[in-house]
Amino acid sequence: MDVTPVLLLILDGFGYRESADFNAILAARKPNWDALWRDYPHTLINASEKFVGLPSGQMGNSEVGHLNIGAGRLVYQDLSRVDVAIEDGSFFTNPSLSKAVALSKQNDSTLHIMGLLSPGGVHSHENHIFAMLEMAARAGLKKVYLHAFLDGRDTPPRSATQSLQLLQDKCTALKTGQIASIVGRFYAMDRDNRWERVQPAYELLTQGRTEFTATDALSALEQAYARGESDEFVKPTAIVSGSAENTMQDGDVVIFMNFRADRAREITRALTDEAFGGFNRAYVPKLASFVTLSSYGEDFHLPCAYTQDAIHNGFGEYISNLGLRQLRIAETEKYAHVTYFFSGGREQPYPGEDRILVPSPKVATYDLKPEMSAFEVTDKLEAAILSRQYHAIICNYANGDMVGHSGNMEAATQAIEALDICIGRMVNAMRSIGGEVIITADHGNAEQMLDRTTQQAHTAHTLNPVPFLYIGRKAQLTESGALRDLAPSLLTMMGLPQPAEMTGHSLIQFAGCNKPVLSAVEGRSALHQ
């Protein structure tokens, strides 16, 4: 089939904000991006709130973004679904959750509720944890322990005090529940196979083995702050109150309240996989049940409360069925997003789909290596483009998001400058084979590095729109759109009809000229490599 080869470059965390105040994207020297933005059609699209299936005021994130991009339609998110279920009361009769509570009551065993205690809404929401505690209280459970993973990444770096106080107040009001441990998400929610981080969290949950203890959660947090730790990096701390055993034991029931899969998978595997080999587990509790709020993937055979509706005829499936070749490429931190999430929750590649995983650098935080593995990704991507094997390539560059999360303005600026070099190489490679490019982002982050309200580093995502830059034929673009419009736009570029299941709209309208104009402007926008 004769189609125009296309490249979708997703610059993770590369939002649009006109103010230069602590804006790493505007601060960066980026001659390639500036030339492309000047010379090619561009617009801004929405990547948060209702435009990606999230509640009003809720920032977008990588999982949500890639689901919407790959599906080519609005995909309602687990956050919204659980919020609605709590509001209409159906949450409290959810079969998987009800069965777990009933099993704990029947066996007079302990119920452990664990998850990211945060109002961030990216991986979890504290209101869901409060509702689960209420459900346990309604059932008359008294042995209920809460294991709070702390955020500081999708929330201000030191903001967990309020969340812990709210949880403690909820326990007091319901007369059930006790906070058994706190730990930063750095340890409990790794997604890069950094098992040396996960192991301390695992040992905290199963043995209470930790360097730090406290008599209550707020005191534990104060001690962590005194050690210079922010919420994300709070070292595992056991809350010791009385003689009761508050770690996970044989016969106990666990409910994991994170709804986003990518950072829930590793700790779940450590707690549930008999063949686990990430580290030596000194003690493995024989849990009566382990329930997840949402599905963490096809390879986890665990009961879950809310399953994602199947997405049929997303971009990857559709072009595969047409016999076309595609490539997905990213470094480790975003690999799941261009594969599993982009494919609507499908683990396995489609026929004709290749995948390239480039390992992320082994550093404590990515501000220590702002370029991350972008140049290695670019080397492999450039070779793939020049091989002329692929009709469509989906690539994610992680830098804007992962370095943006550090709150380090200088490092984030360096990250964007590294990306600019990569952008130049990729656009030139696509030019050489007569291909076309969309450059966009899944959500904002690096364009806002300081929270002027709190005067703390801004480490979270934003509500800002993201760029849509089309590098190809003469065209007119729709003035605005959303992430769901990217797949239809790619199909327009490829000259393919849009399947009925895709309800997004192409942002590209060709202006009566099918001849590429890349070479015509090369003299005044030649890209730096």
Please identify what each model-predicted range represents.
Residues 1-513, 518, 527-529:
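Feature captures the catalytic ectodomains and active-site-proximal regions of enzymes
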